Amino acid sequence: MWGVFFMLKNKSQKVTDVYEAFILDRKSRRFKSGTLQTYKDRILPFVNWCDSNTVFCLSDITPTVIRTYLTQLQDKNLASQTIHGIAIAIQSFFNWLVKEELLKESPMRKVAIPKADKKILPAFTQEDITKLLKNTNTERDEAIILFLLDSGARATELLNLTGGDIDMKTGIVTIRQGKGSKDRIVYIGNKTRKQLLRYYMERGTPKENEKVWLSETKGTPLTNTGLSQFLKKLGIKIDVKNCSPHTFRRTFALNSLRNGMSIYHLQRLMGHEDITVLKQYLALSQNDLQAAHVQHGVVDNL
């Protein structure tokens, strides 16, 4: 890492070097692990693309280079929300470089951020949920599905849980946010706790600081990749689309609102800083009410 610092000081300014410095800055500022991983997922492919296209130095990156990259992403038929998020992350990267005086001006200043479709990706239907639960092969798999549906937890939050984070008597689950950040409380109901106990009987009750979810092949803590692969394979097997951790989170949000939960209570449970996204779910749940009125309204059914 000192080598990176030395090269930056000597104005070498290779794209790969400044990327490492950017990630180091985020780590030193104690960004949450999920946020840090998002930066890596969205910026590193751009850095690698630059390297494979002989764009080695910062001075080689022009607005045209960035537009070419974003256009190629569109040609791959990536979701508009995904491309929008990538562009925002790249913009943050270049803004940081300007702040650090490694660039005089960000090449992103002249690049329009691709618009994201406002539609929300679909949640699971009741039929999807039934199929998911009927086709799990192990106690762990069923426990994971119920836990995600019941808590609205993010994938990283689920995977970081230890035995001491879950109160099996009350259903209170503490989501640890790391130093400098406030922990969050979510809840799981009786059915989820009963299934979790069945999983514990199989794996052994985890100790206070021991990770709850283990790989079934290695016995080591389950990783984000392992979780995603398990859900993807299950979705393909039973023909349920978008079977990812975040679809469970969307399902939790939409069904909580459908069942009458306050949007502000939901905001706290999901750990959102604002309710902008949740308002879109609220609109969907209100559409449900309108459809129900069309079907069951007193006057129109006279």
Where in this protein do the model-derived segments appear?
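Conserved catalytic core of the tyrosine transesterase superfamily
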Residues: 1-302
